[in-house]
Amino acid sequence: VSVCLGHVVTGIMGTNQPLIQRLIEAGVYRAERHWQLPLFPEYGVHIKSTVADINNLGGRPAQTSTAALFLKYFVPENTPWAHLDICGTAWIGEDTTQYFHKPYLPKRGATGHDVRTVAHAIEDIAKATAAKKCSIYTLLTGEKAKPKKKK
């Protein structure tokens, strides 16, 4: 993701637009930028395998989106989820392209990028579910949560 977004923007992908939008808005509030990348099913061809259920290395084309499709394989169907790809924003090295220094960031090393965003989004979702008296699933999908099947 750092090839296309550099060191100032985190890539975000997922299957639930309301969740993605909440994370993007939380990032705006916390001064951490995000850019949504596609999860087109056509990218799945890059992770097909002839010897396993799925291949974890999809090759160079659409690498970031392909990696997110790999993660999607392990998420239960109809579960809202999002992935923040912090490859470019997680670490400050000696690279001069890392021009996004903020007063709370170290000169070098781990940035903690998106910790503030995720914490803010969780707080926002908790407040929204309390105000609407609904589950997170209902908030994000507009559907009532399905009761769990008894064993």
Question: PLM ranges: what are they?
Answer:
Residues 1-151:
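A generic structural signal for tightly packed, nonpolar segments enriched in small/aliphatic residues
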